[in-house]
């Protein structure tokens, strides 16, 4: 049986490969058909934000299967469940920052409305799935996990409002967006 460190490294490489596939394959497929990579990246970002909580839970379940037999449901199992909460929270913030980057960068490419549509939809579904997934997967214990996530979901929402205000004031300053 491979060592625990080796199994965790393999797991993180697998997560990275999944994220790259989710972003790059649809983006380049849409570029091939639409000849517009920014549209493809926006679409892929929304897919990533929708699937990120699901991927986090799936990969944490695999991590639990790796660690929990050694921990025998002791202190380390609680640590693993807190990793799950941090993974969800960090995933939400990173996916939002990526969406904000796409919004700001796409202004010069003239596809801001499509980017706002896809990233906004993906971001809202991401928040919804983060609020609902712990309860659906873990029942009453999941409700406690969701409560732990609340400050990070609020921080993510504040980031969304900040970027929205920035875009609004940039538009008012004479910078226009077009399709």
What are these model-derived regions, one by one?
Residues 2-4, 62-80, 128-152:
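Interfacial non-cytosolic loop connecting adjacent transmembrane helices
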Residues 2-55:
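Cytosolic juxtamembrane helix and N-cap/initiation of the first transmembrane helix
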Residues 6-13, 38, 67-89:
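Transmembrane alpha-helix entry/boundary detector in multi-pass membrane proteins
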Residues 14-17, 41-49, 85-88, 92, ...:
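Hydrophobic alpha-helical transmembrane segments of polytopic
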Residues 17-25, 91-95, 155-168:
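Hydrophobic cores of alpha-helical transmembrane segments in multi-pass inner/ER membrane proteins
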Residues 22-31, 55-60, 90-105:
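Canonical alpha-helical transmembrane segments
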Residues 26-34, 100-112, 162-179:
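Cytosolic juxtamembrane helix at the C-terminal end of the final transmembrane segment
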Residues 81, 95-123:
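Loop-to-transmembrane helix junctions at the membrane interface
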């Amino acid at each position: 049986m491979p060592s625990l460190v080796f199994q965790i490294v393999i797991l993180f490489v697998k997560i990275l490969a999944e994220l790259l596939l989710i972003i790059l394959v649809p983006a380049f497929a849409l570029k091939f058909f639409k000849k517009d990579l920014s549209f493809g990246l926006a679409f892929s970002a929304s897919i990533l934000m929708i699937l990120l909580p699901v991927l986090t839970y799936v990969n944490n379940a695999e991590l639990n299967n790796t660690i929990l037999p050694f921990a025998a449901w002791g202190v380390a199992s609680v640590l693993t469940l807190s990793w799950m909460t941090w993974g969800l929270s960090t995933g939400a913030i990173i996916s939002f920052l990526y969406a904000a980057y796409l919004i700001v960068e796409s202004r010069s490419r003239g596809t801001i409305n499509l980017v706002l549509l896809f990233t906004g939809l993906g971001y809202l579904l991401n928040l919804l799935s983060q609020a609902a997934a712990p309860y659906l997967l873990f029942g009453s214990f999941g409700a406690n996990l969701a409560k732990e996530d609340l400050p990070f979901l609020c921080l993510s929402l504040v980031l969304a409002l900040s970027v929205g205000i920035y875009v609004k004031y940039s538009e008012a300053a004479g910078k226009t967006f077009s399709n």
